[in-house]
């Protein structure tokens, strides 16, 4: 994005707009600190695609209310430069004991949300593989995040 597009996006959020970030949304715009703060964390690295266990830490959020407490699935598991929950609300964490290549130790958020600069931001690190978009639990997770970011109450 150029400077005008940055300004327009910032204006949108400051006027109460919502942002939804999926997977690689944390792996872009490294020279735009406002965007990094909106997303909540920047990508650091990832191991190979493999199975792992996710744990819901906030089962009241529209993006997690339908999920099992423990959710086993296959994806590309991102490590982040900083703890995304430092400024936001962790919704889903990954158990680093269930796969190889995690670098964040005991608290490794994979989905989170926050009120930011007048608007709302929701992010999920899930969604690398095409198969993910055929999984009903993932699609409900994504829809819940979209609805929350848009300020739409759940049905």
Residue ranges and their predicted role:
Residues 41-118:
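Catalytic beta-strand/loop cores that center a nucleophilic Ser/Cys/Thr
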Residues 1-29, 118:
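Short alpha-beta junction capping motif
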Residues 23, 46, 128:
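Histidine-centered active-site/metal-ligand motif
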Residues 27-38:
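Glycine-rich, charge-decorated loop segments at or immediately adjacent to ligand/cofactor-binding or catalytic sites
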Residues 98-107, 115-155:
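Extracellular ligand-binding/catalytic regions of CAZymes and related secreted enzymes
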Residues 10, 36, 64, 143-147:
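Non-transmembrane alpha-helical segments in soluble domains
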Residues 14, 18, 40, 147-151:
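Sec-exported extracytoplasmic/periplasmic mature domains
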Residues 13, 18-22, 89-92, 113, ...:
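Structural recognition of the beta-strand scaffold that forms the well-ordered cores
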């Amino acid at each position: 994005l150029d400077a005008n597009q940055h300004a327009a996006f910032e204006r949108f959020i400051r006027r109460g707009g919502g942002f939804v970030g999926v997977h690689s949304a944390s792996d872009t715009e490294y020279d735009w600190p406002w965007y990094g703060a909106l997303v909540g964390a920047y990508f650091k690295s990832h191991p190979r695609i493999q199975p792992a266990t996710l744990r819901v830490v906030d089962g009241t959020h529209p993006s997690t209310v339908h999920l099992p407490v423990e959710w086993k699935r296959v994806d590309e598991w991102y490590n982040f430069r900083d703890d995304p929950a430092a400024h936001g609300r962790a919704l889903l964490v990954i158990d680093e004991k269930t796969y190889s290549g995690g670098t964040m130790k005991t608290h490794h958020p994979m989905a989170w949300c926050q009120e930011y600069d007048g608007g709302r931001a929701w992010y999920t690190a899930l969604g690398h593989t095409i198969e993910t978009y055929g999984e009903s639990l993932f699609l409900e997770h994504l829809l819940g995040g979209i609805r929350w970011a848009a300020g739409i109450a759940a049905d």
